[in-house]
């Protein structure tokens, strides 16, 4: 609780960053390569936390270049050169693209067959000059589902994440997250999601509890609710 964030291990920094992203109880959680540089044991514990969050009905979008992690999602989109090459369960994607992907141990649990879509994406595209970083991707994600973006570095995963979280405006296409259009209602999107970037977004000079309270203020949580929510998240850590 009182340790500086900069003094924590990689695994604990990861858990703290996740707690900060959860402080305002979001409907959707975006995780951009959340286990980069983290040891295998901490990585396993992190995915166990994600499964518990899914049981609470939180929809999770996670990007990763690691096949073992992608296999723990309910469904994955394989992204290559800015385009989605296929969307299916992890085992089917690995079989379909066996010539590109190297199969690893499969861990797969199906989400409930719920037709309530929290994320709907149609033809979403992002160009930087003549370079197309994300090329007309389309998919839907159900409530309470863990959906993964699998792809190598530079495939377009982070750019797609930034558009879906309202941080980058699409060049073409449309997307709705938590009921809001990402192009025209980006601030509403931000208020209803949690986002954990590759760098964990922590303030290393602040203590653990100070980081959580800071993010509570950023998300506009009423002052009387901040302390109990902080204590609740510290217990999870």
Residue ranges, per PLM feature:
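ABC ATPase "signature
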Residues: 87-88
